[in-house]
Regions:
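Bacterial Sec-dependent N-terminal signal peptides
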Residues: 1-26
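Alpha-helical and His/Cys-centered functional microenvironments
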Residues: 9, 28, 149, 153
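N-terminal, motif-rich segments that launch catalysis or mediate targeting to/interaction with membranes
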Residues: 17-140, 156-293
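Extended, hydrophobic/aromatic-rich amphipathic alpha-helical segments that build helical scaffolds
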Residues: 139-147
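Catalytic Zn2+-binding segment of zinc metalloproteases
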Residues: 146-160
């Protein structure tokens, strides 16, 4: 097994990246380390570009119509119980369109189908030997996959507005990783139990398994935040935290610490799973393309 070290350049990217971007970049960087040779060597040679562009899909949301719905799916709006969701929800986009209609799908998010489409674009890029498109599609695929590993990307209560928990999305996805990422075990190696990439014969099943696991975690994401907010009171739940040259009102460092403890490693586990899934889908796309040199 190879020993993993995050380069200084990548570390600086993580430290100085925009609000909400550091987790995506970290996942892409770690996913590269999980690849087997010869794919590892190719991705490593383009490591800085892939990590830098891990957030391109987010940047497009503000200027490209049709991009925003690729990052989520509000499963709760379809009225399925969790068990029924696993058994009966249409996993193929054509089936879902026929049942619910195009407008409903777009309004509720097309996250898993966006992953599938981007996966096949990556396969095509590998087959054609188009290096620029390989890098672009790999970066986008990693971003969409990572988003589906965030529980709040699978619910219409995306930012806690429906339950009076505004700001919970950035708390879970950004504030906790920024504060505690140094304690996370995120890359495979000699001293890690984390798996390297493997080939997924059925990429669609892999995508939906990750999505369902995220959706199952929503209750705990919301419950522990609500419990701590009630316990700590408004004055200690929030604080003005310095970010760059500004101060932003967000959950206090003490609240974030206790929330981190209550979740018992949940954010770390979802990041670990995202890294494994991203690297495995990159690898699977290369295999499906015929393992081009």
């Amino acid at each position: 097994p190879r020993v993993i070290q995050i380069s200084l350049g990548v570390f600086l990217l993580l430290v100085f990246s925009s609000w909400g971007f550091s987790s995506h970049r970290c996942i892409h960087d770690a996913a590269i380390q999980a690849l087997p040779d010869p794919l590892y060597s190719f991705f490593k040679s383009h490591r800085d570009w892939i990590v830098l562009h891990a957030v391109d899909a987010d940047l497009r949301k503000h200027r490209l119509i049709g991009e925003a719905e690729k990052h989520f799916i509000d499963l709760d709006l379809y009225g399925f119980s969790l068990d029924s969701l696993k058994r009966y929800f249409p996993r193929k986009q054509e089936d879902a369109k026929r049942i619910f209609g195009d407008s409903t799908l777009n309004a509720n998010g097309i996250g898993p189908w966006s992953v599938k489409q981007t996966y096949y674009r990556l396969v095509a890029s590998f087959s054609e030997g188009d290096e620029a498109q390989i890098l672009r599609n790999a970066s986008d695929l990693g971003h969409y996959v990572s988003d589906l590993h965030v529980p709040l990307h699978t619910t219409s209560n995306y930012n806690g507005v429906r339950t009076g928990q505004q700001g919970i999305h950035s708390l879970w996805e950004t504030q906790l990783p920024e504060l505690f990422i140094e304690s996370y075990n995120l890359t495979p190696g000699i001293h890690s139990h984390l798996p390297f990439a493997r080939y997924f014969k059925n990429s669609e099943n892999c995508i939906w398994e990750a999505l369902i696991a995220s959706h199952q975690a929503i209750d705990s994401v919301l419950y522990f935040e609500a419990m701590l907010s009630q316990e700590m009171g408004r004055t200690t739940t929030y604080a003005y935290v310095e970010r760059g040259r500004t101060q932003q009102r967000m959950r206090s460092p003490e609240f974030a610490k206790r929330y981190h403890q209550a979740l018992n490693g949940q954010v770390e586990r979802r990041m670990q799973k995202a890294i494994y899934t991203v690297s495995s889908l990159w690898y699977s796309a290369w295999i499906d393309a015929g393992q081009p040199e």
